[in-house]
Design a protein with these regions (language model features):
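TPR/TPR-like alpha-solenoid signature
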Residues: 5, 12, 32-33, 48
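Flexible, glycine/small-residue-enriched loop-and-beta-strand segment within the central core
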Residues: 128-139, 143-212, 232, 237-246
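Hydrophobic face of amphipathic alpha-helices that form TPR/SEL1-like repeat modules
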Residues: 10-20, 52-54
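TPR/TPR-like alpha-solenoid helical repeat scaffolds
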Residues: 44-59, 236
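Short coil/turn and helix-start
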Residues: 4, 22-26, 40
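Terminal amphipathic alpha-helical/low-complexity segments used for targeting or macromolecular assembly
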Residues: 31, 36-38, 57-121, 239-243
Length: 246
């Protein structure tokens, strides 16, 4: 059984032991991951202890090493405790958001919890799934239709007034070609950028590292593997420019 599957009280107790080095080897990263999970499950003392750690013991460069690699496009270990804690927090936030529905009184609050700092003019229709939420940078008036899948190990930036059709998938992480590296839980992530006033039709897939310029229209079912210049109508698998729009 994964220790992160324990109940809140057990997570709090074991996490505190990792923090203090009582009976187990001191491990602040693991302690924070366990206390964070306990806090997510509603343990009040875990929240207080975690806040104290954050105030008095800022994460060291070593603790954030894999996270920083992930955000900078380097190879990283996706099982790292800091990354794992973020993934778990995001899964819970997505579950709450998806259960609520857009007409729920707490829709805007739950959206903010899932995508921190998102503008009030942004609309995301549930169900929606993301890896971390804090890697999503959505401009004013962005609309995301049903069943969006945004894997934001790398940053995903979407410009103002862009429309994302149903069942669209934006993938920043990529596994290595070498199976030996895959066995070591290594992967990398490249950012995705979509400009302003774009429209992506339904079932579009955008691959790691792709930039789509402003005012582009991407046809339904396209798989975008390379950059698309601004003012382009593009479609296909792989997606290719059909013509200029202006």
């Amino acid at each position: 059984m994964n220790y992160m599957d324990y109940d809140a009280e057990t997570l709090f107790s074991v996490g505190r032991r990792f923090l203090n080095g009582d009976c187990v080897e001191k491990d602040v990263v693991k302690a924070k991951a366990m206390l964070g999970r306990a806090a997510e499950l509603g343990h009040p003392l875990a929240r207080k202890l975690l806040a104290t750690i954050e105030e008095n013991s800022p994460e060291t460069a070593d603790e954030m090493a894999e996270w920083n690699k992930m955000r900078s496009g380097e190879m990283y270990d996706w099982t790292d405790p800091v990354i794992d804690s973020s993934l778990r927090r995001s899964r819970l936030a997505c579950e709450k958001f998806n259960r609520s529905g857009i007409d729920h009184d707490d829709y805007r609050h739950l959206l903010q919890e899932m995508v921190p700092g998102v503008a009030d003019s942004v609309t995301i229709l549930p169900p929606f799934h993301c890896d971390h939420g804090n890697g999503l940078h959505l401009g004013e008036g962005v609309f995301v239709n049903y069943n969006g899948m945004f894997l934001d190990a790398g940053d995903i930036t979407i410009g103002a007034h862009t429309l994302i059709g149903p069942n669209c998938s934006l993938y920043t992480p990529q596994h290595p070609m070498d199976f030996r590296q895959r066995r070591k839980s290594l992967e990398s992530a490249l950012p995705i950028t979509i400009g302003e006033d774009c429209w992506l039709g339904g079932n579009v897939t955008v691959c790691p590292g792709v930039t789509i310029g402003d005012r582009c229209v991407i046809g339904a079912g396209s798989v975008v593997t390379h950059d698309i210049p601004s003012d382009s109508l593009a479609a296909g698998n792989p997606c290719r420019v059909i013509r200029k729009l202006n």
